[in-house]
């Protein structure tokens, strides 16, 4: 199971785990199901970038159904989430464990300024292809996840429902592994999210800001 705020770069972990499982893993990402909502285009036209609010329940039900069906068949699963609350990951982990699965949690630790910048860049990129399909992430939604990520990780650690917790960064490096580290994952995550900026992060911010400026000018927004 994956966790991290919008724009943090969870796709990075997709690639790492696909390689680890030699491609033998099914990726379940709720966002990818939004466009399959029966009234998707209608909702896009009516609500524009706010349509995410109207497709989230559908996407959630799709994820739930797939997890139930595919776990029954015994597939390796990579389930993407934000860790906005602990309810869904806790319930999912318990369901999978009851079916004999080993359940691990992989988090991506990205500075909030960088992840929010990524959501803005992603919106502009999609807008330049098709303004009707562009999906925005509200700052409130993004920050809510960030502000609860550490505490939710701590609660999940205390529940001890994951056999392993790993923390990755955008450069694909694994900076924490509960099988090797005795420190709390939540403590490490807090330092990575809100601590000192390293040189790579500073450069990512600079190039991201330039990219956003270029896209905004091109889109005339």
Indicate where each model-derived feature is located.
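Conserved nucleotide-sensing/catalytic segment adjacent to the nucleotide-binding pocket
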Residues: 25-99
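Hydrophobic positions on the alpha1 helix immediately C-terminal to the Walker A/P-loop
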Residues: 13
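Conserved phosphate-donor/acceptor-positioning beta-strand/loop module used by diverse small-molecule
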Residues: 97-120
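The conserved Walker
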Residues: 5-6
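Conserved GTP-binding G-domain of TRAFAC-class P-loop NTPases and closely related GTPase folds
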Residues: 117-221
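Short catalytic-loop micro-motif centered on adjacent basic/acidic residues
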Residues: 77-82, 104-106, 139-140
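Conserved glycine(s) of the Walker
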Residues: 9
């Amino acid at each position: 199971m994956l966790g991290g705020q919008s724009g943090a770069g969870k796709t990075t972990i997709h690639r790492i785990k696909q390689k680890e499982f030699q491609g033998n893993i099914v990726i379940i990402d709720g966002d990818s199901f939004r466009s399959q909502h029966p009234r998707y285009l209608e909702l896009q036209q009516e609500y524009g970038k706010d349509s995410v609010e109207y497709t989230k329940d559908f996407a959630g039900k799709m994820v739930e159904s797939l997890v139930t069906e595919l776990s029954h068949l015994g597939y390796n699963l990579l389930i993407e989430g934000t860790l906005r609350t602990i309810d869904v990951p806790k319930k999912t982990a318990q369901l999978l464990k009851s079916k004999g699965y080993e359940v691990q949690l992989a988090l991506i630790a990205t500075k909030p300024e960088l992840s929010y910048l990524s959501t803005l860049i992603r919106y502009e990129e999609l807008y330049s292809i098709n303004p009707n399909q562009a999906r925005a992430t509200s700052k409130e939604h993004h920050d809510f996840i960030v502000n609860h990520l550490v505490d939710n990780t701590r609660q999940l650690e205390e529940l001890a429902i994951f056999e392993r917790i790993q923390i990755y960064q955008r450069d694909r490096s694994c900076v924490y592994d509960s099988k090797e580290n005795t420190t709390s994952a939540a403590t490490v995550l807090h330092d990575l999210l809100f601590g000192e900026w390293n040189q790579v992060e500073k450069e990512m911010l600079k190039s991201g800001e330039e990219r956003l400026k270029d896209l905004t000018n091109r889109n005339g927004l």
